[in-house]
Swiss-Prot record:
Modification Phosphotyrosine occurs at: 218
Single Gene Ontology MF annotation: copper ion binding
Binding-site positions, Mg(2+): 198
Cofactor remark from the record: Binds a dinuclear copper A center per subunit.
Pfam families the record matches: COX2, COX2_TM
Keywords linked to the UniProt accession: Copper, Electron transport, Magnesium, Membrane, Metal-binding, Mitochondrion, Mitochondrion inner membrane, Phosphoprotein, Respiratory chain, Translocase, Transmembrane, Transmembrane helix, Transport
Main location group: mitochondrion
Protein name, UniProt field: Cytochrome c oxidase subunit 2
EC number: 7.1.1.9
Gene: MT-CO2
Mitochondrial matrix face of the membrane: 46-59
Cell compartment(s), UniProt: Mitochondrion inner membrane
Length: 227
């Protein structure tokens, strides 16, 4: 989860988030090299006497500054497209969970079970126990099995919302009348926090998301106790 004064991303907990972190580092390195080159050219212009100011044609230079940016854009676009296709790919999910956004809470339905659904409200600050996180704790966590492909169906019953869990690399818009889907897979157990990431009204900041990733046998016990 995030902590105060954090500058980087949260620790990756899914293969998709790991890919996003690698892409971020890759793109940042390209931006750093371009920025260094621009600063170097500016420093040369400021510290040396300008020459060839009357040049009307420089075919080689024009060729270079046309081809080089094209190559840089390709180096950025290819890994980006690869990750986009990976995020849209859904193959034989082990579990499907439908989440609906409301003003201002989330409801969840495990569609593989006959009657397993619940609402998830934020716990007010006055009711928090020692060690719990302000504006992030909920009364009903979303319990899911780790190391399994899970499909999330996301929609809304009123206004636009967005279901987002940063450490898993997830952000899916909840649109009334439309069913969006995404996949997630956690590589380790734990609690993973998120929030609504689309301004949806006065209590937009009070729609936390808590995923509890557990081994399969514990998930089976939990699901049996909820039925």
């Amino acid at each position: 989860m995030a902590y105060p004064m954090q500058l980087g991303f949260q620790d990756a907990t899914s293969p998709i988030m790991e890919e996003l972190l690698h892409f971020h580092d890759h793109t940042l390195m390209i931006v750093l090299l371009i920025s260094s080159l621009v600063l170097y050219i500016i420093s040369l212009m400021l510290t040396t006497k300008l020459t060839h100011t009357s040049t009307m044609d420089a075919q080689e230079v024009e060729t270079i500054w046309t081809i080089l940016p094209a190559i840089i854009l390709i180096l950025i676009a290819l890994p980006s497209l690869r990750i986009l296709y990976m995020m849209d790919e859904i193959n034989n999910p082990s579990l499907t969970v439908k989440t609906m956004g409301h003003q201002w809470y989330w409801s969840y339905e495990y569609t593989d079970y006959e009657d397993l659904s619940f609402d998830s409200y934020m716990i007010p600050t006055s009711e928090l126990k020692p060690g719990e996180l302000r504006l992030l704790e909920v009364d009903n966590r979303v319990v899911l099995p780790m190391e399994m492909t899970i499909r999330m169906l996301v929609s809304s019953e009123d206004v636009l919302h967005s279901w987002a869990v940063p450490s898993l690399g997830l952000k899916t818009d909840a649109i009334p009348g439309r069913l969006n889907q995404t996949t997630l897979m956690s590589t380790r157990p734990g609690l993973y926090y998120g929030q609504c990431s689309e301004i949806c009204g006065s209590n937009h900041s009070f729609m936390p998301i808590v995923l509890e990733m557990v081994p399969l046998k514990y998930f089976e016990k939990w699901s049996a106790s909820m039925l």
